[in-house]
Every structure is written in C-alpha cells, then in structure tokens.
Design a protein with these regions (language model features):
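Adenine nucleotide phosphate-binding catalytic loops in nucleotide-utilizing enzymes
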Residues: 117-121, 151-193
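Phosphate-binding loop of NTP-binding sites
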Residues: 4-141, 147-156
Length: 193
C-alpha cells in the first residue's frame, strides 16, 4: 500500500514537470500497436522529442515508472493504460492526465472480472476522467458501444473524434492493404473529404 502511494506520488510529480502533449491509449486489444504507431509518427515529427511507455508497462506499477522516465524536454508522451477490473484505468488516467485519450476497441477481454460488455466499455471510458481541459477523445465508431463512449467523453467536456469503417466515423477507413515490410497501406477519408 505504501509502495503504491509512493508510485502514484512519483507519477504525479513526473507528470507535473513536463509541458508535453500527452496521449493515453487503452482498449481491449491493440493498445501496444496503436501506442507504437503514434510514437513512430510523433518521434519523427518531433525529431526525437517523443516518449512512450516501455513495452506494455500499462498498470499501477508500469505507468508511474514510464512517467518518471519521460525526459523533461519531451514534446509528446504516449502512455498505454490497461486494466483487469473496473476502477483501474480511473487511477491511471489521473496520473497520466492526457490531452488526447484513445480507446482502440471494446472486446470481451476480462469479461470474467467485469461481467458484461457494457461494464467493459464503462471501465475503458474511465480514461476520459483524466483528460486535461479541452481534451480530445478518440473512439471506435464500429463498436456497438460507440454511443456510450461518446456520451462518457462529452460528459467531461471532451471533443470527440471517431474512427473506423462505419459511415458515421469522423476518420473513415476506406481500404487497408498489407505491405511487404509488415505494415499496411491505408486509405482514409477525413471530415474535410
């Protein structure tokens, strides 16, 4: 208990010493891949001034350590947040205090602990509670829980951006072609057309 409180204090102190734009990522699957893709883009754009959580350091120990390792000169920080039970992401997001909160997907991971898909969606939506004022929530438009996620984000005053194949998505995936290097060539439609 004292160790956990010390880690939380470390996380809060580490977060308060940086002026970086912070991105938090959660979801039932795809957290690490999305975190790494965001990092690769921002690392290149910022000429090395981006930081990310190491591996899958996404719990009550890993998140504080990842925050503590973030250089003060960082322009961007990307942090993965995972959970097994309701309430865990709420604790992590208040440490991370993201400007952008991303939910990759809602799937039956940890359903044995949460009991229903609705409960999983609610637990993932906890990430919005830590959003900085004026923050942005990025949600999966293809999820049957997208309306609930959008409500949760709007309840904290977040700007909402949805993504996916759904016609209603703000950023709509039109095509994805696997490439020889292991990536994919994607075609997306943005709000401007």
């Amino acid at each position: 208990d004292d160790t956990n409180r010390a880690l939380e204090a470390l996380a809060r102190a580490a977060r308060s010493r940086v002026e970086a734009t912070i991105i938090g990522v959660t979801g039932s699957v795809g957290k690490t891949g999305v975190k790494e893709a965001i990092f690769a883009s921002l690392e290149r754009a910022s000429r090395g001034a981006a930081h990310r959580s190491t591996r899958s350091y996404n719990n009550h120990v890993g998140v504080p350590l990842s925050l503590a390792r973030m250089p003060a000169r960082s322009r961007f920080g990307i942090f993965e947040m995972g959970m097994n039970h309701a309430g865990e992401i709420a604790g992590l997001t208040t440490q991370v205090r993201p400007h952008v909160a991303v939910i990759t997907t809602i799937a039956p991971a940890h359903i044995e602990n949460l009991g229903s898909m609705d409960a999983i969606a609610a637990a993932k939506a906890e990430i919005f509670a830590g959003l900085e004022p004026g923050g942005t929530a990025v949600i999966p438009a293809d999820s049957e829980h997208s309306a609930a996620l959008e409500r949760a984000a709007r309840d904290v005053g977040a700007r909402v951006v949805s993504f996916g194949r759904a016609r209603s998505a703000d950023v709509r995936l039109l095509d994805a072609i696997p490439s020889a290097n292991g990536g994919s060539l994607v075609t997306c439609e943005f709000p401007e057309g």
